[in-house]
Amino acid sequence: EVNGNKCTVPKLKDVINVCKGKIKLNIEIKTGNNDSEDFVSDVVKIIENTDFVDKCVVTSLDYRALRKVKECNPKIKTGYIMAVAMGDFYDLPCVDFFSMETTFVNGRVVERAHKLNKEIHVWTVNDSDSLKKCVDLEVDNIITDNVAGAKSAIATHGDDVFSIVLNQLK
């Protein structure tokens, strides 16, 4: 219930159908103790049945879920959400990219990931200093709560790299 109104949670296939042809989706799988054994494969089937394999990424804090996604369909791009970026995490075979908070990103992290053909996706980049840092480090994806602010910061800077990011935000 929201503001006194009864609401229903939309089904994934309905969300995909609304987004089709407009935006790509980051589908986060949050696992729990009560999940069925087929939970992850059911998500993959929905992605496949809606012809959305190349229009989404699937992310999770649970590496086992990402491994299951790749077992079901290796073409689906997967991202490991990291609460902290410590240790030797770079060579996880079922991960195409790492999603991490902006404070954990530095040149060494980006360089090591890129050497293994892994991307770095950074969240939550809501100010121009963080945006500039991410662009300078050549991260692969920026996640923000403030798209208008990010566009403004990029437009103000005027750099070629910033212009490339701006085009991705459009």
Predicted segments, located by residue:
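C-terminal active-site rim and adjoining tail of enzyme catalytic domains
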Residues: 4-5, 79-170
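Metal-dependent phosphodiesterase/phospholipase catalytic core, i.e.
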Residues: 1-77, 94-95, 100, 114-116, ...
